[in-house]
């Protein structure tokens, strides 16, 4: 994606999330899981419940869905993410994406990651103490999560502006599927050349057929069913 892209979002693709959430709370008409490989618009999950704004009032990010609830991922020391164990058996941290109402086993390797997710999205206070996880005053060896969680990727292993930085994305933060670029506006070009005509009504495909230039996961501002991409990719 490029700065100035105006991207249409199908808000009914995974069930229509009702807005404003300050009136209804979280409600969704119809529910459909997000498939792997689709480009998705979602609200910024980095602050979780610590952000006093309602979820639908937060910044809008886009990324492609790399992993779904129940998947296991291997993350090496360089931040590369794999859906299968690397063949060279390099040291990796293994994390499982939580499913709604399913228990996840906690280990010294993964509890820091889950501790952050519990504090942000599960409405509980958690802390790692002496290689053990303490949740709401009790030491636990597993935890039952109340949301489905997704891994959103920037499509570039060197750019960590994705779930490697802000963590798993809960289902409550999902807005919809990116369907096409309505138009693209280059604000740095002369006035007569600002419209990137070749990008007008460009269809957004799955990750294996459509990748952003430079791979940066852009953020934007939600207006109706469109996202205005504001970040410039290298």
Model regions and ranges:
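Extended hydrophobic leader/signal-anchor segments used for secretion and membrane insertion
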Residues: 1-234
């Amino acid at each position: 994606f490029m700065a100035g892209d105006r991207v249409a979002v199908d808000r009914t693709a995974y069930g229509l999330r009702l807005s404003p959430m300050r009136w209804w709370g979280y409600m969704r008409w119809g529910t459909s899981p997000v498939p792997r490989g689709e480009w998705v618009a979602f609200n910024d999950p980095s602050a979780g419940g610590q952000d006093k704004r309602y979820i639908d009032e937060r910044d809008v990010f886009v990324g492609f869905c790399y992993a779904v609830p129940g998947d296991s991922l291997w993350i090496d020391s360089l931040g590369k993410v794999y859906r299968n164990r690397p063949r060279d058996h390099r040291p990796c941290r293994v994390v499982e994406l939580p499913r709604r109402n399913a228990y996840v086993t906690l280990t010294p390797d993964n509890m820091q990651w889950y501790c952050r997710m519990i504090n942000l999205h599960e409405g509980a206070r958690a802390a790692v103490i002496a290689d053990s996880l303490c949740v709401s005053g009790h030491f636990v060896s597993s935890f039952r999560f109340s949301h489905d969680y997704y891994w959103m990727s920037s499509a570039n292993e060197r750019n960590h502006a994705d779930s490697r930085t802000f963590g798993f994305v809960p289902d409550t933060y999902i807005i919809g599927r990116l369907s096409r670029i309505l138009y693209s506006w280059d604000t740095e070009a002369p006035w007569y050349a600002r419209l990137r005509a070749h990008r007008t009504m460009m269809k957004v495909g799955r990750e294996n057929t459509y990748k952003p230039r430079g791979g940066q996961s852009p953020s934007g501002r939600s207006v109706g069913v469109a996202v205005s991409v504001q970040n410039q990719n290298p």
